[in-house]
Regions:
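Long, charged, low-complexity, helical-prone intrinsically disordered regions
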Residues: 1-405
Length: 405
């Protein structure tokens, strides 16, 4: 069995995610987005918008500044000239994925016939599910709240938390998980549901994929997107179960699609595409949002980069080590620091609440490169300034580097 060094594994992983290639010289187009999605497979969705919403960030991190309408049009609009490219589903967590790949998750839709959560609510309300579908047929694309109002259902006094949702909203979400409904569009990030057959092409809706074939394809795509990964890494990409991935990996290895290797310092074997080229140089510089596919499986981040990373949104402010919404900084293929970022629209600034260098890193080198990326990000977000707070061992040097730009 081939043995790779940790550095080789890291270079493979970074390159597989598209960071080793130069950014487009011209505008980022729909074709650029299509190629990126074919490579990384998913753009995770998240409601936090303290800097920029999560599904926009991985595109910026790999392709540079771009018009976010490119993603919006690909995901939430359709025309004969510009067909819908992306669709929402539980691919990793809630995520955008290629429309053509939606049938690969039919097995999951069957598992979620009564929803992903709150299944007892759906089971005891079969008529309500029929009523929701009828309401959507009558209303067209509608939010869960609009569906609820149309049905004359009792609405809760507060908005937001899952545990405060009405039965109608639970059932609507369950119908999404079951593939009966999907997202037609989003307005202010609110999901507008419609019947899946009204949103996706008839050929996609009609396509049936054998469960084993779908699982092999998802496993292969996960392994390819990761570049190199253990069974646990590969499982996490599409949130598959051990019993699904083990036979898929065995079949892919037997068919010569994947090669099993060892990596120095890793306790489990890893898999990579057969014939995978190992990059010789460390490349890739970018700010990474917490839900970037390169880093969304934290055990792999620790193994690849020796970088301990946890999101601290739900940690009480006084107990946070680094901050509320912290972006790791990738420099020449290594994670060398992190910044807690906030877009302050009223102040026209991308504000660095805290800045931290990793142990052993040359702070001046990190600060100079980071300042450049922050300036680029601020411009992309339509903000004229980068400001740096006092928190963190890198803050002083980063502030000086920003001022020099």
């Amino acid at each position: 069995m081939t043995t790779l060094t940790g550095a080789q594994a890291r270079r493979i992983a970074v390159a597989a995610q598209g960071f080793a290639e130069p950014r487009p010289r011209g505008s980022v187009t729909r074709a650029c987005l299509r190629r990126l999605i074919s490579r990384i497979q998913v753009l995770q969705l998240d409601s936090v918008s303290v800097a920029v919403r999560a599904h926009y960030a991985p595109v910026f991190s790999r392709l540079g500044p771009y018009d976010r309408d490119v993603v919006d049009r690909a995901a939430w609009s359709h025309s004969a000239r510009s067909p819908r490219l992306l669709v929402e589903y539980w691919a990793h967590e809630a995520a955008l994925m290629a429309v053509d790949d939606w049938p690969l998750l039919r097995w999951r839709m069957r598992e979620y016939t009564h929803g992903r959560w709150g299944t007892q609510i759906v089971r005891k309300n079969p008529r309500l599910a029929d009523d929701v579908v009828a309401a959507v047929k009558e209303l067209g694309p509608a939010t869960a709240g609009q569906i609820e109002a149309h049905l004359g259902a009792e609405q809760r006094g507060r908005k937001g938390p899952w545990w405060d949702r009405s039965d109608t909203k639970w059932v609507t979400e369950a119908l999404f998980a079951a593939g009966v409904l999907t997202t037609a569009t989003r307005v202010g990030f609110a999901r507008h549901y419609d019947l899946t057959e009204n949103v996706l092409p008839a050929a996609v809706v009609a396509r049936e994929v054998d469960d084993d074939e779908a699982l092999r394809e998802l496993t292969l795509r996960a392994a390819t997107a990761l570049g190199i990964g253990t069974e646990a890494d590969i499982r996490d990409y599409f949130r598959l179960a051990p019993g699904q991935v083990k036979p898929a990996l065995a079949k892919l290895e037997a068919d010569g699609e994947l090669e099993r290797v060892e990596v120095d310092g890793w306790s489990a074997p890893a898999y990579l595409r057969a014939g995978q080229i190992i990059p010789r140089r460390d490349r890739g510089t970018a700010l990474l949002c917490p839900f970037d596919p390169l880093i969304f499986f934290r055990p792999r981040v620790q193994r690849l980069f020796d970088f301990h990373y946890r999101i601290e949104i739900y940690v009480p402010a006084p107990k946070r080590q680094f901050g509320y919404y912290v972006w790791p900084f990738l420099l020449d293929g290594s994670l060398v620091g992190r910044v807690d970022l906030k877009a302050e629209r009223t102040g026209d600034a991308l504000h660095v609440v805290g800045a931290f260098a990793e142990p052993g890193q040359q702070s001046s080198r990190v600060a100079e490169a980071l300042a450049t990326e922050l300036r680029t990000m601020a411009s992309w977000l339509g903000l004229s300034m980068v400001t740096v707070g006092a928190k963190g061992d890198l803050a002083k040097e980063l502030r000086a580097a920003v001022k020099r730009r």
